[in-house]
Amino acid sequence: IHDLKEAMCVRLTGTLHEEERAPHGRELRISHVEILSSPAEPLPLAIDKWKLNTSLEAKLNYRPIALRNVQERAKFKIQEALVRAFRDYLYEKGFTEIHTPKIGARGAEGGANLFKLSYFHKPAVLAQSPQFYKQMMVGVFDRVFETGPVFRAEKHNTKRHLNEYTSLDFEM
């Protein structure tokens, strides 16, 4: 086992035993380890550490590898749990989930700068909010909600503001 390295493919042989402390009540007691393949070169990031001590640029350049790190994956699990709780609560209260367009010909509400783009050689913008569509759909379904990306083309003086984020919107 001491010769094992990250990204190796192995076959484990052993016996399955009941163990109440194990996550699913069982554990494999290994009697043999066979290395099936080794990586051609070491991974560019040490994914076995709790925290990736590297730059954002390196994390993005090696994103498929960085996401194998437990802390990097945890960010997605937290987002998923928040969105699921929001959805579950609103479903329980009789809301209908809608999915609004994210590309439009113009902005639906004022006040926010828009990301402009060319869409099949015509000017378009990314959605800054689902508000216009929610107000239209509430007349149909009475209670509506959406979880989805929104885009704001605004410069910020801090690193804590995002130009794209997941919006949790409801209307009744």
Locate the predicted segments by residue.
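Class II aminoacyl-tRNA synthetase catalytic cores and aaRS-like
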Residues: 1-172
